[in-house]
C-alpha cells in the first residue's frame, strides 16, 4: 500500500516455523435485528491476518485485532447439542481452572454439574425467570458468551437469538462455533493474558 518493496520469503509453505491465522471482522452492531450467527453466506466486512509462533498465538492475535476482548469477568456457556457439550467439556474445565466464573443456561449447567464443573445457572430469556441471562449481561457479570445453537435453522424469536442480540448490543465477545471456542480456550490456556503476546517485525518471519 505504501509502494515499498517487500522481500518474498525464501521458504516454501511447508518450511515456515510460524503460523498465520485470518479472523473476520463483522458489523452486526450496525445491523439492527440481525442475528450474529454464521452460516454459509458471507457476513464479514473485512479480515485481519496475524502471525505467531504457533496457531494459538496467531489465533489470539487475530481475534484481538478485530476487537475481540479477552474475558476478565465471567463466561456464559450455552453449548447446544449433547455432542457440542461433550466436545467443549475439557475447555470448560480449563476455564474453571483459569479462575473465570462460569455461568450456564439450564441444560448446559446440568451437564457441567454432572461432570464436576461448577457453574451458576441462568434462565433462558423466553423462560422469563430470575436469575436470567439477559439481566446478568445487563448487570455486567459476563464479558464472553459461547452460544452454540442446536441447529442452523433461523427462527425470529428464540432464546439463543435474544442472547446473541443482547451480546452484540453490549459489545461483548461472542463465539458461536464449538471448534472456534475450543481453539480460543486453548489459546487462553497456553498464553494467558494478551500482554504475553509478542509483536515481531516482518523481517523475523523471513
What is the meaning of each model-derived region?
Residues 188-189:
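Histidine/acidic-residue-rich catalytic or RNA/ligand-binding cores of hydrolases
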Residues 1-175, 181-184, 194, 200-206:
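ATP-dependent carboxylate/acyl-activation modules
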Amino acid at each position: 500500500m505504501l509502494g515499498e518493496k517487500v522481500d518474498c520469503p525464501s521458504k516454501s509453505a511447508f518450511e515456515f516455523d510460524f503460523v498465520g491465522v485470518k479472523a473476520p471482522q463483522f458489523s452486526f452492531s450496525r445491523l439492527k435485528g440481525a442475528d450474529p450467527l454464521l452460516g454459509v453466506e458471507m457476513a464479514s466486512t473485512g479480515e485481519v491476518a496475524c502471525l505467531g509462533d504457533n496457531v494459538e498465538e496467531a489465533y489470539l492475535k487475530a481475534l484481538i485485532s478485530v476487537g475481540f476482548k479477552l474475558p476478565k469477568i465471567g463466561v456464559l456457556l450455552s453449548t447446544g447439542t449433547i455432542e457440542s457439550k461433550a466436545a467443549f467439556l475439557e475447555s470448560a474445565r480449563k476455564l474453571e481452572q483459569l479462575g473465570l466464573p462460569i455461568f450456564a443456561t439450564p441444560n448446559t449447567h446440568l451437564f457441567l454439574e454432572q461432570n464436576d464443573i461448577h457453574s451458576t445457572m441462568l434462565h433462558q430469556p423466553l423462560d422469563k425467570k430470575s436469575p436470567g441471562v439477559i439481566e446478568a449481561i445487563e448487570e455486567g457479570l459476563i464479558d464472553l458468551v459461547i452460544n452454540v445453537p442446536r441447529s442452523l435453522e433461523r427462527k425470529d424469536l428464540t432464546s439463543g437469538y435474544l442472547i446473541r442480540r443482547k451480546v452484540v448490543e453490549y459489545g461483548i465477545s461472542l463465539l458461536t462455533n464449538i471448534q472456534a471456542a475450543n481453539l480460543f480456550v486453548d489459546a487462553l490456556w497456553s498464553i494467558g493474558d494478551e500482554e504475553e503476546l509478542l509483536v515481531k517485525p516482518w523481517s523475523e518471519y523471513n
